[in-house]
């Protein structure tokens, strides 16, 4: 086992006597010096060199005092910004970036995304570091007074629209209302969909994003969602809508509504139209409120109560990977079900299909009683644009899960009965590997017509490895082996071609390329095991901090952080076991580090800080994924401790991609981040469970959640002792 060394990256890995540690979560931040006390009265905030009117307006800004009572899950919002990491341009302000549904802020209803926090109780947080702002919020007690500043709502153009109901009703969908906010902090009723051919579509004036103020004489400001639906339904043929049009300023990137599908629980619109809108015998599904440009949340992270059970119509455009899902079923009329969604594939990107969906029809072909072969043919011959009628039936699908489990048990028992050394006794047949690179057969000049393309992290069952150039293999997913069978390049072929490429690249260089062959990655042998804990999560690469924070704040029941250890003395307000595990002596902690009881440790101000294996295990055994901000070295240490993490590498495609994902960093910062990521990939690729890329943080975050969903278990693939 390699020894632990002191490293210099952020959070609880410190460089001695340099910068203070930014610790692993808001619950474990060191006390920092705050600005001088600020005298606050009911009319104004008074601070040196700064004066503003509370609950009034000044210029283009307005100010509000909001009092929140801390709930079981905290205050219920996320922040970004600070002097050390500005959120918008060079502005050091502390901004609200997310309102957590059901939390204290959401229940109060006044705090909004993009609000800037000026004071927390009497603590000035206008020009402080991010960690100081978090500390101020943490130490604010159970009753927290926030003084916030926000842009004045842009002037809205109000107009009256007269609609005459047609065969498709009024022809639009709505979202919002008290207790069901479409935009956090805003109880308004918004138009979220215009149905083609409906009255609103033909009239042309009502648009997505419009706010409905009144229907005939019934006001819709600050009403329940159900009341708005009732008001629209209880109208005669002629309907007068009072509508507020958003200004262009509101549509700008900096102050647009947040990505509600990644930050908030999905709510469902109510379509103001007849159920025959889709032109099918199946009833119309309710439509998600989220704009199509936003990525959907992985289904189990939302909760099944948010998933409609009615049949719904989905249109998918076939991509280079096909439709991007696998099916099971088709025996004795049991139905065809989706068993796997390929991350990044067409089905995944559409966000409208999920594991457990029964496919009722494809392009009008009824599959309710189809065999597996008939369904596969229907999907294969469906063309580029495929219309699917699907219905979510998790209970029926669970029968397949049980069947798969029984088959797996039979195979395991059979394997135990015949011996377990199959790979050693016959290394050229019947073993499982994980791909450590992407393979596109069309880019291999010597590829076979029956070759099988695959992605990094795919598990493959090698059926026949007798040929030195090509192995016959079948793709494997967590729940079953697929019908995807073909030839993959052998380990020897991959390494020889990569060696040739590197040799040509380094031709003529002084360093040469001696020894490179050993570093070429192809495949690693894996074995399947069952786990009874929530796998720890290690995210690496650019935007990892934001992804970690969002997972913790958005899904506090599914993700958690562990309590670190330290040798420094306990402060008055700290509690042992909550803020830190306070170690009695440096010698004891050093011995534990040498005994490999820590996955990572470092020193700051002559005190040791570290994350122990036991702390991670405690979170994992509580059923929560432990979010770890550690280096890639920790992956192997966790594996050695039989706590197999999900390690996700966020790979930037280019320097421009880094700048696009994080618009508030400079080009120099982006270049350093890109270089660090490149080096990280070169050194630790084999440690990654998955590699994700994206053009925006929202796309990356969605893929991260999908990876966690797919790799959570209980059956997982882990490195095997046998080597190829």
From Swiss-Prot:
Gene3D superfamilies in the record: 2.30.42.10, Guanylate Kinase phosphate binding domain (3.30.63.10), P-loop containing nucleotide triphosphate hydrolases (3.40.50.300), SH3 Domains (2.30.30.40)
Domain SH3 positions: 428-498
Keyword Magnesium: no
Major subcellular location class: membrane
Any GO CC annotation of this UniProt entry: neuromuscular junction
Modified residues (Phosphotyrosine): 240, 580, 715
Keywords: Cell membrane, Cell projection, Cytoplasm, Disease variant, Intellectual disability, Lipoprotein, Membrane, Palmitate, Phosphoprotein, Repeat, SH3 domain, Synapse, Ubl conjugation
Tissues in which the protein is found: Brain.
Residues covered by region (Disordered): 15-35
A GO BP annotation: cell-cell adhesion
Cysteines engaged in disulfide bonds, as pairs: none
GO molecular function: acetylcholine receptor binding; beta-1 adrenergic receptor binding; D1 dopamine receptor binding; ionotropic glutamate receptor binding; kinase binding; neuroligin family protein binding; P2Y1 nucleotide receptor binding; PDZ domain binding
S-palmitoyl cysteine-type lipidated residues: 3, 5
Positions carrying Phosphothreonine: 420
Self-association state and partner proteins as the record states: Interacts through its PDZ domains with ANO2 and NETO1. Interacts through its first two PDZ domains with GRIN2A, GRIN2B, GRIN2C, GRIN2D. Interacts with ASIC3. Interacts with SEMA4C. Interacts with CXADR. Interacts with KCND2. Interacts with SYNGAP1. Interacts with LRRC4 and LRRC4B. Interacts with ERBB4. Interacts with KCNA1, KCNA2, KCNA3 and KCNA4. Interacts through its first PDZ domain with GRIK2, KCNA4 and CRIPT. Interacts through its second PDZ domain with the PDZ domain of NOS1 or the C-terminus of CAPON.
Domain notes: The PDZ domain 3 mediates interaction with ADR1B.
Function, as annotated: Postsynaptic scaffolding protein that plays a critical role in synaptogenesis and synaptic plasticity by providing a platform for the postsynaptic clustering of crucial synaptic proteins. Interacts with the cytoplasmic tail of NMDA receptor subunits and shaker-type potassium channels. Required for synaptic plasticity associated with NMDA receptor signaling. Overexpression or depletion of DLG4 changes the ratio of excitatory to inhibitory synapses in hippocampal neurons. May reduce the amplitude of ASIC3 acid-evoked currents by retaining the channel intracellularly.
Name used for this protein in its record: Disks large homolog 4
Organism per entry: Homo sapiens
């Amino acid at each position: 086992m390699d020894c632990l060394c002191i490293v210099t990256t952020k959070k609880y890995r410190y460089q001695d006597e340099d910068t203070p540690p930014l610790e692993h979560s808001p619950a474990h931040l060191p006390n920092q010096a705050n600005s001088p006390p600020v005298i606050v009265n009911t009319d104004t905030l008074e601070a040196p060199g700064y004066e503003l009117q509370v609950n009034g307006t000044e210029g283009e800004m307005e100010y509000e005092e909001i009092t929140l009572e801390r709930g079981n899950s905290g205050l219920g919002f996320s922040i970004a910004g600070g002097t050390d990491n500005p959120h918008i341009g060079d502005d050091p302000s502390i901004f609200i970036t997310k309102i957590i549904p059901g939390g204290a802020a959401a229940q109060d209803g006044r705090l909004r995304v993009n609000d800037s926090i000026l004071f927390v109780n009497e603590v000035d947080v206008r020009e402080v570091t991010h960690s100081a702002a978090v500390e101020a919020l943490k130490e604010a007690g159970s009753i927290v007074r926030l003084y916030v500043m926000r842009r004045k709502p842009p002037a809205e153009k109000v107009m009256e629209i007269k609609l005459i109901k047609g065969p498709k009703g009024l022809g639009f969908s709505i979202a919002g209302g008290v207790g069901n906010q479409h935009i956090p902090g805003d109880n308004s009723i918004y138009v979220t969909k215009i149905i083609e051919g409906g009255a609103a579509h033909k009239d042309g004036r009502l648009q997505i994003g419009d706010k409905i103020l009144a229907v005939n004489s019934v006001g819709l400001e600050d009403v329940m969602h159900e009341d708005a639906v009732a008001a629209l339904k209880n109208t005669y043929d002629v309907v007068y809508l009072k509508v507020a049009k958003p200004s262009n300023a509101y549509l700008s990137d900096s102050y647009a509504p947040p990505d509600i599908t990644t930050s908030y629980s999905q709510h469902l619109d109510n379509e103001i139209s007849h159920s025959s809108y889709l032109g099918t015998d199946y009833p119309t599904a309710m439509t998600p409120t989220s704009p199509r440009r936003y990525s959907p949340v992985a289904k189990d992270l939302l909760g099944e109560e948010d998933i409609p059970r009615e049949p719904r119509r989905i249109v998918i455009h076939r991509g280079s990977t096909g439709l991007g899902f696998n099916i099971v079923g088709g025996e004795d009329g049991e139905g065809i079900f989706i068993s796997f969604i390929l991350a990044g594939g067409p089905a995944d990107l559409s966000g409208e299909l999920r594991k457990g969906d029964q496919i009722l029809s494809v392009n009008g072909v009824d599959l309710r009683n189809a065999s597996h072969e008939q369904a596969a043919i229907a999907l294969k011959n469906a063309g580029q644009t495929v219309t699917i009628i699907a219905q979510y039936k998790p209970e029926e699908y669970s029968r397949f899960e049980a069947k798969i489990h029984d088959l797996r048990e039979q195979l395991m028992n059979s394997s135990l009965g015949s011996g377990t050394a199959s790979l050693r006794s016959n290394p050229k047949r019947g073993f499982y590997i994980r791909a450590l690179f992407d393979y596109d057969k069309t880019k291999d000049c010597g590829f076979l017509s029956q070759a099988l393309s695959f992605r990094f992290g795919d598990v493959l069952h090698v059926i026949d490895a007798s040929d030195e150039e090509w192995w016959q293999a079948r793709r494997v997913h967590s729940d079953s082996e697929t019908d995807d069978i073909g030839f993959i390049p052998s380990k020897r072929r991959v390494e020889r071609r990569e060696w040739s490429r590197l040799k040509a690249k380094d031709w003529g260089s002084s360093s040469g390329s001696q020894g490179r062959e050993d570093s070429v990655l192809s495949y690693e042998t894996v074995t399947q095991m069952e786990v009874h804990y929530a796998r720890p999560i290690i995210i690496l690469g650019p935007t990892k901090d934001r992804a970690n924070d969002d997972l913790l704040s958005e899904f506090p029941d599914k993700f958690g952080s562990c309590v670190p250890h330290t040798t420094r003395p306990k402060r008055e307000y700290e509690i042992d076991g909550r803020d830190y595990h306070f170690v009695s002596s440096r010698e004891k902690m050093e011995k534990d580090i040498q005994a490999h009881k820590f996955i990572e440790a470092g020193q700051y101000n002559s005190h040791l800080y570290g994350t122990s294996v036991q702390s991670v295990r405690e979170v994992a055994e509580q059923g929560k994924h432990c979010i770890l901000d550690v280096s890639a070295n920790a992956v192997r240490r966790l594996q050695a401790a039989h706590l197999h993490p999900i390690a996700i590498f966020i790979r930037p495609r280019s320097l421009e991609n880094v700048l696009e994902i994080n618009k508030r960093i400079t080009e120099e910062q982006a270049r350093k981040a890109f270089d660090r990521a490149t080096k990280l990939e070169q050194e630790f690729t084999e440690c990654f469970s998955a590699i994700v890329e994206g053009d925006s943080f929202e796309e990356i975050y969605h893929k991260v959640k999908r990876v966690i969903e797919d790799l959570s278990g209980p059956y997982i693939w882990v490195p095997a002792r046998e080597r190829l």
